[in-house]
Amino acid sequence: MKTKKLLTALAVLSVVFFTGCKNDEPTNVDNPTAIPTQTTKQAEVALNGASNFAVLAGAAITSTGATNITGDLGLSPGSSVGGFPPGVLVGTQQVNNPIATQAKLDLTAAYNDIAGRTSTDIVTLSGNIGGLTLTPGLYKTTSSLAVSSGDLTFDAKGDANAIFIIQIASTLTTTSGRKVILKGSAKASNIFWQVGSSATFGTTSVFKGTIMAMQSITFATGASLDGQALARTGSVVLAGNTIVKP
């Protein structure tokens, strides 16, 4: 009898252990209260010639109001840059020249790099990610993401070199006043957003990271970015914004 009870107990423990250890498939998260911690560390992202640009676009760059940009501004193959002045650029302007052309080529390479990354413990997000705390690693969605209900936090858990990559198949949006918050030594320069179409940031929203959008990036009045706004084929539209390249 004792032997039978012992074997039964061991069988139960075996089922629990092997079930709990299975982690071969991506983790799906739909408005979760807790995000799984990833063990796979992401390698650095090489922006090369695009690394000095706070704003880089393909078609045009337009600004209204008192926009302030710290970092270089580049455009290629387009040639239309408007709004400086009254906008203030603390950096150099490179328009349809060899420097801007190379920066766009390097942006394309970096975009393709992060878009193609995979991981055994990648976390799949969907819909509104406001209110969540993301730890280092690779995240993806097959549709769009929004920071629309609560602020979004990145927690590097004390690792100042930790990399965050978010792959977005379609659009990225924030609603008015929403913020991205950094904690645990997280750095804006280590957060990378790969956006399959366009990104739009609501009035007075505060965002962080390098945004690499396939199409356009639009900032509503008073929105700010601690990072880089890099649009591959479309325009970057500004309206009294503050953008500081880390």
PLM regions and their residue ranges:
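Bacterial N-terminal signal peptides that target proteins for export
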Residues: M1-A9
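Solvent-exposed adhesion/ligand-recognition segments of exported proteins
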Residues: K22-P246
